[in-house]
Amino acid sequence: RGLGAGANPEVGKTSAEDHKSEIEDALEGSDMVFVTAGEGGGTGTGAAPVVASIAKKMGALTVGVVTRPFKFEGARRTRQAMAGIEELREVCDTLIVIPNDRLMQLGGEELSIVEAFRAADEVLHNGVQGITNLITIPGMINVDFADVRSVMSDAGSALMGIGSARGDNRAMTAAEQAINSPLLESTMEGAKGVLLSIAGGSDLGLHEVNAAASMVEERADEDVNLIFGTIIDDTLGDEIRITIIATGFDAEANMTQAAAQQQPQQEQRCLLYTSP
């Protein structure tokens, strides 16, 4: 009937299970499925694991990209989100969790609530687009689906960092932004798998690609499977955009390390399934 789940995950779960055949029909023939959701409510929390489970059983590389609620959304919503995230982690090849509270560090004190939720949506979009563009858009250095699968299949938790820069040292600046993105609750130190997307205009230099890739490689495991591709997009002008997806790291140890680092400051086909 087009109604929501009333912030009840069981309602969202039951609704998805009752429409299993329709979901299977929608996913038929997909090599890769992205399940995106805002965790904490009914539909995203309850339905997303059902969709992901179906996709994985059908043989698709299944990637979850979800947001965790803002603190102001309440303790109950946060508890539901954490439970939903753990359930989703069990049925996805790779799960990327974006903490909405971190978005406030990107917008400053003047960030409106409309802008905050729009930013959360944009981060989800950018995460998916950063991966799919590697596969679907030709570049100087191309990446195919097998490359992406080698990094993301049964990888568990993943980190996503995004950076952009113009002018002098733009590649290094963008890479540094992506590596130290406020969206990261953990560091990518010791990552055993990394997808690196570098987008720029036709003036994108090989030395810039090398500099960015080398910086990322230094932070990862010495035997990292680093898959990187370049995308030529002249609409970017002199801007370079870098997206990093890192997998295969010790999340608990890296979160402790990230907290310690912040303490001194006090502070081929892809199908996208979206749950509100």
What spans do the regions from the language model cover?
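Tubulin/FtsZ superfamily GTPase core signature
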Residues: 1-276
